[in-house]
């Protein structure tokens, strides 16, 4: 345990030390310079040692906010643990590197045979795992269909007589479809090729209100039902 002095200056120095946190106070007392605090000189030496250690522990940020010289090179402090936040080569080094490259190119070009770059030797990257990225040599060619071949085959299969008969005949359904188109060109357009375009009259409204004949059975049913109800109430 350190020994403390009883003088007024010693008390003031201890009060200054107590302004710091408890952890710093305990750490300062454990140092070798703060073991004997009976004299003022020892107290001053202890305070100086604690201040030096505290200033060494505090982080130094780039900038002249405290009017102190920077201890680190500001080029190193820009999140150097990331690849994209590092500074590039300096102008002097880049200029020197470019000059060396030019000199090497001139010496290589003096022989008249420029050295092929490694990229020229390699095959250009083509996305062969995609259909549209395959090179020209492996391009899929579309299958060509020749209509003349089909006509020749059909001509061989059917003789001339059957072929003339097929050309002269036309299906009945085709004539029925073509005639209404010419007749109803001026009239309103009806969607007759769908089921719901023009339903037959006997199936409109569920088949109940198509004609007077279809209404009579429904009226008789209502009459019979009313008569039965009247007889039941009379009994």
Curated annotation (Swiss-Prot):
Family per similarity comment: Belongs to the POMC family.
N-acetylserine: residues bearing it: 124
Keyword Glycoprotein in annotation: yes
Cell location: Secreted
Keywords annotated in UniProt: Acetylation, Amidation, Cleavage on pair of basic residues, Endorphin, Glycoprotein, Hormone, Phosphoprotein, Secreted, Signal
Entry-listed glycosylation sites: 152
Modification Valine amide, positions: 136
Segments of this protein annotated with the region Disordered: 88-128, 169-209
GO CC terms in record: cytoplasm; extracellular region; extracellular space; neuronal cell body; peroxisomal matrix; secretory granule
Pfam families: ACTH_domain, NPP, Op_neuropeptide
UniProt GO MF annotations: G protein-coupled receptor binding; hormone activity; signaling receptor binding; type 1 melanocortin receptor binding; type 3 melanocortin receptor binding; type 4 melanocortin receptor binding
Tissue: ACTH and MSH are produced by the pituitary gland.
UniProt modification remark: Specific enzymatic cleavages at paired basic residues yield the different active peptides.
Phosphoserine: residues carrying this PTM: 154
Modified residues (Phenylalanine amide): 87
Basic and acidic residues bias spans: 112-128, 181-205
An example Gene Ontology biological process: positive regulation of cell population proliferation
Signal peptide: 1-26
Record protein name field: Pro-opiomelanocortin
